[in-house]
């Protein structure tokens, strides 16, 4: 199944939050969740280790979850 980020990627707020992660994290997220690229392809295209891409994705997801849940509390 899709995760929260994949399901809500079209949502403007989620998109802006992803972009606020900054490079290279935002590019990794766009490649992974918007264009559905494989992690090994992302690592090759960006010149990063596969483990680096995985780490940045999981850290970024944690950050996004925190930012998005904070935003929900404010709504």
Where are these regions (language model features)?
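Acidic, proline/glycine-rich intrinsically disordered inter-domain spacer in sigma factors
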Residues: 1-19
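Short, locally clustered residues in the helix-turn-helix/winged-helix DNA-binding domain
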Residues: 19, 33, 65
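The N-cap/first-turn positions of alpha helices
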Residues: 24-25
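A short pre-motif secondary-structure segment
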Residues: 28-32
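Residue-level signal for the short linker/turn that defines the boundary of a DNA-recognition helix
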Residues: 36-37
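DNA-recognition helix of helix-turn-helix
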Residues: 40, 46-70
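Intrinsically disordered, low-complexity basic tails/linkers immediately adjacent to helix-turn-helix/homeobox/MYB/SANT
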Residues: 74-75
């Amino acid at each position: 199944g899709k995760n929260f980020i994949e399901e809500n990627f079209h949502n403007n707020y989620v998109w802006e939050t992803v972009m606020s992660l900054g490079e290279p994290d935002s590019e990794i997220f766009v490649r992974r969740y918007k264009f559905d690229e494989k992690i090994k392809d992302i690592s090759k295209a960006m010149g990063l280790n596969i483990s680096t891409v995985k780490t940045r994705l999981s850290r970024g997801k944690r950050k996004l979850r925190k930012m998005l849940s904070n935003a929900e509390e404010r709504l």
